[in-house]
């Protein structure tokens, strides 16, 4: 069946890819020799682990990666094929695809989960393959050429149950089966973060656990008519390289916390134990303001269509001391600002474990996409009772250039470009610390005891006491296991709402250095404008109903931002001016501190109560209402798609040891060729870890 040209165009890699270099040299040079060695070895571990992302994205991503590692390692490739085999433009299209692929560590966008295909035709790429006539190139081209270009309906997006593909699951499994196995896992307190689930035969399933070790015997369990086999050794070749390089970092740890953290990482990745990984996070949160900050593992569940399994990521970074001082002040005043959030103190943890909050310059972020900020650990039991860390990734946030901004008024263009970086730093800071770092979950322990005073804590939405039977997380349940695929968009919405709710606060603005009233007002105005515009742009990440399949949001943050746009529109602080080919966001600055803050606060309170009380049914109803895309917004979506711009990809530095054992840092051009060069330098043609 032929694919409509409009569909093909939506999935073609853009001709121009915005490539930015993550500048880390200045911060790296300030490290001691020992710190540089520590950073280097963990960086190598992160990168080798990142090849797991290829297999977590699609079955063809691994062969595509190896195809490019071999193809672009060929000397004088461009002069060999241009202009005799392909044109300059066609070769540039190939570079754009390869850079986008490397930037996403797979052939599906990390932000949006939709497949992208080369703009250079398959026939022309075949001519390049024929010309170089390399055995490895031919081998990997044979393994990936069909799927690389396929836009069959089933493979256009990530998903399950016939609505996309996912390598976290076998193609023959249903959501009902996944849910049943999840109930088994909850009953045994087995974390899904480092697992995949494959159906072997009727009522027979392999639960794969990621581990370097393959010697742990398979154990079979019977559960409600299912046979569930727990099989260790998933991603064993990749994790063996991770473990080997983490061991090399051990002699260069700065303190006991780092040593113990590394040992627990090694134990976890070798054995597959999530409990060991939890212990690594306990040591990590105790390692306050290290010169080299790092974390590694199966962390975020955004890309699991079911919402519980973690994607590999690892980062290494250096502290930006000047910006970290601002975040430190935010942390020091946490008690004051948490009390300003729109819920009763009984919905807040009894003790706020003051987190480490630093601004970092990223040396390495090895995964499918780089965030602007992070709040870890993601383990609820650690975050709720022991603490967490916040980081803002300064050189990621700062990687932008002045440009014409779509969907805002001409009168806002100059202000938006001038203040968007500062406004975004403010939003990220509040989002991570007071968003992800706030709130309490009402839970039940193994003995049936709850963590609140029965009869005294009132649900503000019902004005009745919290029910210790129905409004709590049962023992073994977690936020992710209860909220599943809704968990990420709901939590991102809650954190984003905290950011915009508190950003007009004078005291917070002063902490960030915005003491001039006019500039302070402009900063929070731009912050709210960024959010309103993001709600419009979010429509790019919505797939409308098609051939019986329901509409689907493909990105948690963007679903959250559309939800917030709905809140803005309902309150009247935002209006949309629509024409045949454009839509303009108009935000009433005079209403932000009054009507706007109240509307966001009321909505935020609902999110917090639903999260605290494990109320998944009310949450589904709320999100169905606030993120429904009607005919009016489907028309706006067409405008958004016509004006969409590709997301930036980041070229990262490479570290290596010279003949004297010193760490050297190599930078690359901020171009598609620079992105390719960085990956060829980093990995070469080593495919020994590919399954």
Curated annotation (Swiss-Prot):
Membrane spanning segments where?
Answer: none
InterPro entries attached here? Dipeptidyl-peptase3, Peptidase_M49
Q: Which GO terms describe its cellular component?
A: cytoplasm
Catalytic center at which residues? Answer: 432
Places the protein is found: Cytoplasm
Cofactor(s) the protein requires to work: Zn(2+)
Q: Name one GO biological process term.
A: proteolysis
| Entry binding sites for Zn(2+) | 431, 436, 492
Cofactor binding, per record: Binds 1 zinc ion per subunit.
List the EC numbers from the record.
Answer: 3.4.14.4
Which keywords accompany this UniProt record? Aminopeptidase, Cytoplasm, Hydrolase, Metal-binding, Metalloprotease, Protease, Zinc
Coarsely, its chief localization is cytoplasm
**Annotated catalysed reactions:** Release of an N-terminal dipeptide from a peptide comprising four or more residues, with broad specificity. Also acts on dipeptidyl 2-naphthylamides
Q: Which Pfam families match?
A: Peptidase_M49 (PF03571)
Instruction: Output one GO MF annotation.
Output: dipeptidyl-peptidase activity
Q: Which family does it belong to?
A: Belongs to the peptidase M49 family.
Kindly provide the name given to this protein in its UniProt entry: Dipeptidyl peptidase 3
């Amino acid at each position: 069946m032929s694919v409509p040209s409009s569909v093909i165009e939506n999935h073609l890699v853009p001709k121009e890819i915005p490539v930015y270099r993550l500048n880390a040299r200045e911060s790296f040079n300030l490290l001691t020799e020992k710190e540089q060695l520590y950073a280097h070895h963990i960086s190598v571990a992160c990168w080798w682990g990142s090849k797991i992302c290829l297999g977590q994205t699609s079955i063809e991503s691994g062969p595509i990666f190896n195809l490019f590692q071999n193809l672009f390692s060929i000397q004088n490739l461009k002069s060999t094929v241009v202009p005799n085999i392909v044109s300059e433009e066609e070769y540039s299209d190939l570079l754009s695809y390869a850079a986008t692929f490397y930037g996403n560590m797979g052939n599906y966008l990390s932000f949006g989960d939709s497949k992208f295909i080369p703009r250079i035709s398959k026939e022309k790429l075949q001519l390049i393959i024929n010309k170089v006539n390399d055995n490895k190139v031919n081998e990997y081209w044979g393994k990936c050429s069909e799927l690389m270009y396929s836009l069959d309906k089933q493979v256009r997006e990530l998903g399950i149950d016939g609505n996309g593909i996912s390598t976290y699951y076998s193609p023959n499994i249903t959501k009902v089966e996944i849910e049943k196995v999840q109930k088994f896992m909850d009953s045994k307190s087995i974390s899904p973060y480092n697992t995949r689930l494959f159906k072997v035969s009727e009522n027979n399933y392999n639960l794969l656990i990621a581990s370097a070790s393959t010697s742990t015997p398979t154990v079979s369990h019977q559960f409600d008519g299912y046979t569930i086999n727990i099989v260790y050794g998933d991603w064993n070749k990749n994790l063996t390289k991770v473990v080997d390089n983490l061991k090399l970092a051990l002699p260069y740890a700065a303190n006991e916390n780092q040593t113990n953290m590394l040992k627990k990482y090694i134990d976890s990745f070798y054995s597959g134990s999530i409990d060991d990984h939890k212990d690594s996070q306990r040591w990590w949160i105790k390692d306050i303001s290290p010169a080299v900050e790092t974390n590694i593992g199966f962390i975020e569940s955004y890309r699991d269509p079911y919402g519980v399994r973690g994607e590999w990521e690892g980062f290494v970074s250096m502290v930006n001391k000047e910006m970290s001082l601002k975040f430190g002040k935010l942390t020091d005043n946490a008690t004051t600002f948490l009390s300003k959030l729109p819920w009763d103190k009984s919905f807040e943890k009894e003790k706020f474990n003051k987190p480490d909050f630093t601004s970092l310059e990223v040396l390495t972020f090895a995964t499918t996409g780089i965030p602007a900020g992070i709040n870890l650990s993601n383990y609820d039991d650690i975050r709720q009772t022991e603490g967490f860390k916040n980081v803002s990734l300064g050189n990621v946030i700062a990687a932008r250039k002045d440009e014409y901004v779509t969907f805002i008024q001409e009168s806002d263009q100059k202000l938006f470009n001038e203040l968007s970086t500062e406004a975004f730093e403010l939003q990220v800071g509040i989002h991570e610390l007071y968003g992800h770092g706030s709130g309490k979950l009402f839970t039940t322990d193994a003995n049936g005891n709850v963590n609140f005073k029965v009869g005294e804590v009132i649900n503000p939405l019902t004005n009745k006491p919290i029910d210790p039977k129905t409004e709590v997380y049962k023992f073994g349940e977690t936020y992710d296991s209860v909220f599943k695929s809704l968990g990420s968009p709901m939590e991102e919405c809650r954190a984003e709402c905290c950011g915009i709710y508190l950003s007009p606060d004078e005291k917070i603005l002063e902490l960030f250095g915005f003491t001039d009233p006019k500039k302070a007002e402009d900063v929070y105005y731009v912050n709210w404008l960024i959010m309103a515009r993001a709600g419009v742009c979010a429509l790019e990440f919505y797939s409308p109903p098609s051939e019986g399949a329901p509409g689907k949001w493909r990105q948690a943050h963007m679903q959250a931002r559309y939800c917030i746009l709905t809140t803005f529109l309902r309150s009247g602080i935002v209006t949309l001016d629509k024409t045949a080919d454009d839509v303009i966001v108009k935000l009433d600055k005079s209403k932000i501190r009054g009507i706007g803050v109240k509307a966001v606060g009321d909505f935020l309170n609902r999110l917090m109560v639903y999260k605290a009380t494990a109320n998944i049914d009310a949450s589904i109803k709320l999100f169905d209402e606030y993120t429904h895309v009607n005919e009016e917004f489907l028309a706006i979506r067409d405008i958004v798609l016509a004006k969409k711009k590709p997301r930036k990809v980041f070229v990262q530095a490479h570290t290596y040891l010279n003949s004297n054992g010193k760490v050297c840092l190599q930078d690359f051009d901020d171009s598609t060729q620079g992105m390719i060069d960085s990956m060829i330098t980093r990995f070469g043609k080593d495919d020994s870890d590919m399954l």
